[in-house]
């Protein structure tokens, strides 16, 4: 008898039904490393805010992981906010 995947896996599969979310997930996975919101948005042709919304949903589902890091060489006060970066979640 076949068994169904755990509910968490089914929920993750359901999240990928959205074409924008699926494209963003595919881009992050294909990149093989960290991807910024701007990079992901540009790659799939959507606005940054929409990309951020979908990427954060993928993080909440456990499909992606997020971290913060300054991308430029500047440090200290006035260096700006660290970028939120996404990568495929460890299995």
Q: What is the meaning of each model-derived region?
A:
Residues 24, 39-43:
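A short acidic, leucine-rich amphipathic alpha-helix
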Residues 1-23:
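Short alpha-helical segments that sit at the start of domains
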Residues 62:
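Glycine-centered, phosphate/nucleic-acid-interacting loop/turn motifs that mediate DNA/RNA or nucleotide
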Residues 38, 48-49:
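Key DNA-contact positions within bacterial/archaeal DNA-binding proteins
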Residues 19, 31-36:
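Short capping segments at the starts of secondary-structure elements
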Residues 55-56:
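Short, hydrophobic-biased segments on the C-terminal half of alpha helices
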Residues 73-91:
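Conserved segment of winged-helix/HTH DNA-binding domains
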């Amino acid at each position: 008898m076949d068994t169904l995947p755990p509910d968490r896996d089914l929920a993750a599969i359901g999240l990928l039904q959205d074409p924008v979310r699926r494209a963003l997930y595919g881009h992050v996975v294909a990149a093989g490393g960290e991807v910024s919101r701007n990079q992901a948005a540009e790659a799939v042709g959507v606005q940054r805010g929409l990309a951020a919304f979908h990427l954060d949903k993928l993080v909440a589902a456990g499909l992606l992981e997020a971290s913060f890091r300054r991308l430029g060489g500047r440090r200290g006060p006035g260096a700006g906010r660290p970028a939120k970066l996404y990568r495929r979640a460890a299995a």
